[in-house]
Amino acid sequence: MQSRYTALQEALAGYDKTGVPLVAYNGKALLPAGFSDDIGTYYFIPKIAHTFSLSITQSINIFFVGMLLISLILSVTGFFLLFRSWTSRFISVVGLLGLAFLAFRIGDVYLIFVYTILSLIPIFLYLIQNEKLKTIFTAFIFLSGIGIGTAHYSRSHAGTAVLIFLIIMLMLYLKRGWREKLGLVALLLVGFSVSAIYFNALLSHRETYLVLNQPNYKPVVGSHPFWHSVYIGFGFLNNDYGIKYSDSSAFNKVRSISPKTIYLSQEYETILKGEVIKIVKYDRHFVVYTAFAKIGVAFFYLLVCANIGLLASIFYPKGWSMELAFWLAIGFNALFGILVVPSSAYLLGFIALATVYGITSIGYAIQQGALSDIKNFMHRKEIQIRQTT
């Protein structure tokens, strides 16, 4: 995205000029880096560029491609440990490579959903079933919390689905006492809090620096725009409101109501929230019709990515608690496509979870003798055909 690329260039210029993370410089004044976006990438990418004297393009490639490769290696390792069958391992590699290729083609901050899912879930599934690795499992839970928190600050809610998955698995699937389960959940949340405290400290330092060094600077509270995205999401289908899936569509609407409102400010979000509520209240048919159109696209992605894993989960169940954990996580990541637009970018976290679900379901089915059952079924059918002829 060109606007994000420009913002990263300004973030690097600000870091080179001041030495303070998350301070941008546009050639005229200092300003907050990534004000209307999630700050993680505006911290890590300029840091890489500054530390190793690289261009912003090189740093973007190192960050996104490097993280994709690391998460791919971790996920393959996790599934190789989880499954003993080489058939299951082969299927996992094929599925993960396909997902990695799609993620690479989409690119940008949407990749962070894939990083979190691939880096954590396969290894977690292995560790939760191995009582001999309690110490490693405990450390993994804490580090997972830090990773999820970092992902959240790099792309809003990029780790929330994984957090949901881990908590449900810890509380309902793990075969330990309730006190120990609650302790692990608390440890997971402590890890998340470590990331939150760190990034909030960076923001606080940034704001203090700008107040002292940039004349007339007013502290801001940056957050990922929600109602802006929901409003333009109504532009998925042709409509009577003139809404299109374009930032300018929301911007023009706000300006028609309040010409002096600053783009993506709190007042801006409040105005769009009111417009969304009006549409929901007075045109429910349009809202429901649009929602089901988006759900239909998401369902198609589910069928493609989970594919025969859906059938495998029916005939060879993994246990209700694991199913619940997966489906609540998948459902959460589907919300991005349903609330905004069901593009492959917005649904990349949904696609990644569906793929991991499919791989896991097939692997568990093979462990329960699915291949032997299929072979026996085909043999019986062959005998029946011979008898009838």
Which sequence ranges carry the predicted segments?
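Transmembrane-helix motifs of polytopic, lipid-linked glycan transferases
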Residues: 62-86, 119-123, 306-309
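Membrane-proximal stem/loop segments at transmembrane-domain junctions that anchor or position
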Residues: 1-27, 205-294
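Hydrophobic, aromatic-rich transmembrane alpha-helices
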Residues: 70-79, 296-320, 370-378
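Membrane-interface transmembrane helices that cradle and orient dolichyl/undecaprenyl
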Residues: 118-140
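Aromatic- and kink-enriched transmembrane "portal" helix at the membrane-lumen/periplasm boundary
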Residues: 57-61, 68, 93-116, 148-149, ...
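Transmembrane-helix signature of polytopic, membrane-embedded enzymes
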Residues: 76-101, 134-135, 320-324
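Loop-to-helix entry region of an early transmembrane alpha helix in multi-pass inner-membrane enzymes
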Residues: 30-73
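Membrane-interface alpha helices of multi-pass inner-membrane proteins
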Residues: 140-155, 167, 187-196
